[in-house]
Amino acid sequence: MDAQSSAPVPPPGCPAHGGRVPLYGPEFAADPQSYYDYLRHYGPTAPVELSPGVNATLVTEYSAALQLLQDPTSYRRDSRRWRELNEGRVPMDSPVLPLLVHRPNALFSDGAEHLRLRQAITDSMARIDQRRLARSTRQVSDFLLAQFGYRGSADLLSAYAKQLPLFVFNELFGCPADIGDRVMFGISGMFDGVNAEQSAQVLFGAVGELIALKRSRPGEDVTSWLLQHHAKLSDEEMVHQLSLLLGAGVEPLGNLLGNTLHRLLTHDAYAHQGGLIDEAIDDTLWENPPISNLGPHYPAADGEFAGEKVQAGDLLLVSYAAANSSPILAAERRASSRAHLAWSAGPHACPSKDPARQIAMTALENLFNKLPDIELAVPEQMLSWRPGPFNRALVSLPVRFTPSESAQRPQPAESAKPAPAAQPAGKGGRWSQFLNWLSK
């Protein structure tokens, strides 16, 4: 990579003169596109730092990203190959490690093992009834809107976009009240970074109980279908596959909802109905994908990638955001509005993109049908984005609207705050409240 010949100017606040470009911090969060524009001066790949002491090569060019994603023989997903980690050069307390270290699930597996685990997931997800999914999403949407619709204002991110996927996935996976409360506590805590280790233990414990329940009493849900699959997943494999599906589904989908809402509320070209919501989802996936940079790969052998030398075990990361926004992609975008890489590509492409899109579409349509005059409560420039290399996510999305006459003020028990982060939710958590509301 010859960064000196073109002498690109780093974006403001970027300490990248002659070194790796940091993909973290408030400057990157405020304007990641200027970083991607700068990184393109290096060529199809660029040297980056994911957090202090964690180095990677970022693939920023669309065709190079496809080459990486579609060649599982030359570039592996098993992070036990990560050379710098094996050499002790990666800080073990780095905040990015939880999303990169190996776990025995489909995301970090290769070859026949990956095919077995992935097939169980794709076959089970394919059994989801689309009408049931739409109905469940509308019910969850109505419940959440009832919690704040009477107020005339809300943080749409914490009250709606982040909550809705948790509820819908709980229903899809067949969680009873007590287990569902703990699943929601565990996932929220892991992604919020508050007591993450305890939250992970709560999640794994709840998922383990769910698996035991579904082995003895199967139902029409994803958990039961995974257990019944001919892949014959062990209990340990089930825990990791379910945790992967929940974690990889809930957080990105919540951010897709948040980012699409941001787009709909800040671009006058969109109407809050019909096909334009669908168009706004596509535009968000192109220009502001919820997962900006991920898809870790490791060369199986020393060689060359995109014109640059690579060593076996180097960490190569795909920038879905940079690849999607490449200036040379205008023709591809005109040819297909869904040729973006937001769902990744190749054998590790998102297996849940169709249900995720349906959930997003249904949730947004129902929101704007119930609150048609919703608008930002603050100037757009006051909105802030969470720092970090992987997700593109707002901190909050304050809105105002005419209070909904159909929204009922929740009773004190229903409006109770979630359990403190220091302790798991007990009986009467959010999922229990929803099930009680649904039964009325």
Enumerate the predicted regions with their spans.
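Cytochrome P450
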Residues: 1-440
